[in-house]
């Protein structure tokens, strides 16, 4: 009988600790976010041309999957119809001085959480100040919560 009670006791303690840990991680992520950054430059297509658009859909917070997936073909259709080149990524490594200047417009497509490092934010801000076009779609403003 004591073996059964010990087993039940340790099972209860284990379950309690597991649930507490899960809730703690969930609360931490909800309040502070857990950010993953891409800093290495990425491989871009060679045929970008003079009218090129970057569609950036990274989510370090809540991911609006349905909205992101539904919008990508629409951006492709618009680009094709207007003769624009389009590049879609969730890799923030493209936010560097050498690659960002290859685009005339950047669309933040339902981005959430803090998706750029401080250095990438500085580069992006300068790119906008130098005349780059920026469009923020739906949750793109969610980055301001951090």
Predicted segments — roles?
Residues 3-6, 51-52, 121:
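Basic side chains
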Residues 8, 35, 87-88, 108-109, ...:
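Mixed-charge, polar/low-complexity N-terminal
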Residues 14-102:
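Aromatic-Pro/Gly-enriched surface loop or interdomain linker
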Residues 53, 100-146:
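Short alpha-beta junction capping motif
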């Amino acid at each position: 009988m004591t073996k059964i009670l010990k087993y039940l006791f340790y099972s209860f303690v284990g379950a309690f600790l597991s649930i507490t840990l899960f809730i703690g991680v969930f609360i931490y992520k909800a309040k502070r976010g857990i950010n993953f950054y891409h800093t290495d430059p990425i491989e871009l297509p060679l045929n970008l041309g003079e009218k090129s658009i970057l569609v950036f859909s990274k989510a370090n917070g809540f991911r609006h999957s349905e909205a992101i997936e539904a919008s990508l073909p629409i951006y492709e259709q618009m680009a094709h119809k207007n003769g624009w080149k389009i590049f879609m990524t969730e890799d923030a490594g493209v936010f560097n001085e050498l690659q960002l200047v290859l685009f005339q417009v950047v669309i933040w497509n339902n981005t959430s959480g803090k998706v750029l490092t401080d250095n990438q934010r500085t580069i992006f801000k300068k790119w906008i100040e130098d005349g780059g076009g920026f469009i923020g779609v739906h949750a793109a403003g969610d980055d301001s919560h951090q």
